[in-house]
Amino acid sequence: MNKKTQTISNYKAKNLLFLSYYFPPVQVSSSIRIKHFFEGFIANGFTISVLTGKFPKKMTGEQTINLPISNIYRIPLFGLRRLFSNFILTHYTLPLLWKKKVFISSLLSFRNRIPFNLIIGDGGLIYLWIAYFKAVKWIKNYKITHLFTSHSPLVDHFIAFLLKCTFPHLHWMADFRDLPVDIKYPHYMNYSLSKYFLKHLLKKADAVITVSKGIANELEKFHTKINIYSGSISSEEVQRPTIISPYFTFNYTGSIYPDYQDLSPLVKVILSLIEEGIINKKDILWTYCGLHPFKYEQWLTPHFPNEQIDIKAFLPLPEARERQQMAAINLVLTWSTSIQKGILTTKLFEYLDTGRPVLVLTNGVLETEMKRILSFYQTEGYFQNSENKGLKNWLTTMYIRWKNNQTYHCDRKKIAQKFSEDERNALIKKVSDKTPTRKNT
């Protein structure tokens, strides 16, 4: 083996089954984290076979992984989401007005709860069985040694659980981008059942990975080996725009959860600065790209004309990145409670990769992890929704700098060192280090 083909790990054959309902180039935010793991496993010397969902063309963009995939099979989807997509779904997600209908909201509630999410949730029962039997065949034919799955949806973890029961030699790594809703909201009637289910499910996992300490604290109730991977920043220098945008642009990319996220505190502060003559209203431009354009419009249209609101449901990845790189400020809207902490969106790391200023608005209590991560990148920019004075002062500074063609210092080099691809690769080596024997195959 020559130097070009040498990898981080030893040279023993390591064959990974990458079981992921979402997989690039599907245009959802989770694809970014999935892509990072895929690249990390390649760097650690794995041969990878992929089982994933077969999505409509409008959900897929350009290929974003230019690395070798040994085998890939896209499973037809027949779940509740697929059923609705033929009638009322917009870009594979329900409009917010439909979600407020009693019947639909009740159905969605069951769809997200254990055990119903395994039957009618994303993926569904047909996806589950096709993936399981395809995986059984691949494990035997391709001598699979490792499994990787990522929640959500939970169905991938359950398939891995079944495979681990069938083939005990497999080394299973389970990733949680978020907690299952039944664990996240203890007031649900099936909370005890969900805890029992998750505890027995994760007994079969050899390693568990999650995005933050907050979620790790919850998962420690179900597993002893919790590892944290928040995200990574490429060490490659980004090409920053040489021309400052003619507008003071606020850019938001991603989904919106209207019961938890709230843009109105920012809008109120900006309107106050306009009223005081500090900001010229005509300088403002709002850009949005994501699955919930209607809610974003609801926040803005009472206060700003249509020509100052540029909203797209879907954009190709290069165009979305161009918006982020041209923005005066990239927005992160998150939330935090005494029960639910550690909500880290992958969009934060996507923003940090651009070298442009980031504003994090938290609805609720202080989110220390998010604030700490941002502190490696810029001196200010994290605010709770109630911190009107601090937010007002920061926006004033940002606007004056933009008006004077001055850039705001963002230390992309420092954040790239702190959350490097090497750190990611080392974590993957750690959680996958056990090389199983080839028994019972």
Segments the model singles out, each with a brief description of its role:
Residues 52, 73, 171, 181, ...:
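Donor nucleotide-sugar binding/catalytic pocket of nucleotide-sugar-dependent glycosyltransferases
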Residues 283, 288-290, 295-321, 378:
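Nucleotide-activated donor-binding/catalytic signature segment of Leloir-type glycosyltransferases, i.e.
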Residues 383-393, 400-434:
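A charged, aromatic-enriched C-terminal amphipathic alpha-helix characteristic of glycosyltransferases
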Residues 36, 118, 126, 132-137, ...:
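Membrane-proximal helix-turn-helix segments that form the acceptor-binding/catalytic region
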Residues 1-81, 207, 216, 273, ...:
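N-terminal subdomain of nucleotide-sugar transferases
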Residues 243-261, 267:
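Conserved donor-binding/catalytic core segment of Leloir-type glycosyltransferases
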Residues 53-126:
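A conserved catalytic-core segment of Leloir-type glycosyltransferases
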Residues 261-264, 316-318, 322-323, 330-349, ...:
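Nucleotide-sugar-dependent
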